A protein has these predicted regions:
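Bacterial Sec-dependent N-terminal signal peptides
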Residues: 2-42
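Low-complexity, intrinsically disordered segments exposed to solvent
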Residues: 26-247
Length: 247
């Protein structure tokens, strides 16, 4: 009887410790929204065709708007080419289930394809106080391969209302090139700002800010760009339904 009681107590102790460990894990941190890394250029692109735009300086609306559209297109090109691998890696994480590591850290591990090549991604999220620290490591095998390259990192608020990303150019040129600051209101991202932070680059500190606001002109771009001799600014606001707006 004594052995039976001792064994039962042992099982209860093990069960208690196991349950306690599960409780200590808590829930995995919520991934920042995909829109926190990728600006939605679709509304702006559709507004470039057949839209009516006015400008503060009469007669300059066409050239100003066309240049703004070109500049926005450059940012879109950067995201869709230079940074397509880390962006694709982040998008793929939403269909994966994380596993608990330790020290309030969870990991998403999976494979994905970008530019006709296969990669392995390892995204970690560690909760520290009111923030989550994110790190994305990417591995490529074969030609031009590399292992566990930290392609981007960042932080987000635990409540999911905002955060920041830092993206590195490539495994061959591992220097920080893009900073993304984002904020969220309700179920949608209210503002995203791309800032070019690559050192020794004349375009450093150039930025593009995209946001959604209330009112008739409910979307906007603010573009701070380098003309080759100086920095200038353009602000574009438009209605996402009618595609009309102003520069």
């Amino acid at each position: 009887m004594k052995r039976y009681t001792t064994g039962l107590l042992g099982l209860l102790l093990i069960a208690s410790l196991t349950t306690g460990c599960k409780k200590d894990k808590g829930d995995p941190p919520v991934l920042p929204p995909a829109e926190s890394m990728v600006v939605d250029f679709s509304n702006f692109a559709s507004a470039t065709k057949g839209a009516s735009f006015s400008a503060d300086a009469k007669g300059t609306e066409n050239s100003t708007y066309e240049f703004a559209a070109l500049t926005a297109g450059v940012w879109k090109l950067i995201i869709n080419t230079t940074l397509i691998v880390p962006v694709s890696a982040f998008k793929a994480s939403f269909s994966e289930a994380p596993e608990y590591l330790d020290d309030k850290t969870w990991q998403w591990s999976y494979t994905f394809t970008a530019l006709s090549a296969s990669y392995t991604a390892r995204l970690t999220g560690q909760t520290v106080a009111s923030e989550v620290i994110w790190k994305m490591y990417i591995t490529k095998t074969g030609n031009g391969g590399f292992t566990d390259f930290l392609w981007f990192e960042g932080t987000s608020k635990v409540d999911g209302t905002g955060g920041q990303w830092i993206l590195y150019q490539s495994a061959q040129a591992p220097q920080a090139c893009l900073q993304v600051d984002w904020s969220r209101s309700g179920d949608s991202v209210g503002k995203v700002t791309y800032t070019w932070i690559k050192n020794s680059d004349p375009f450093k500190t150039s930025y593009l800010e995209y946001g959604m606001v209330t009112g008739d002109l409910d979307a906007y771009f603010i573009i701070h760009y380098y003309t080759g001799t100086k920095f200038s600014d353009i602000e574009i606001r438009w209605n996402t339904t009618t595609k009309n707006g102003r520069v």
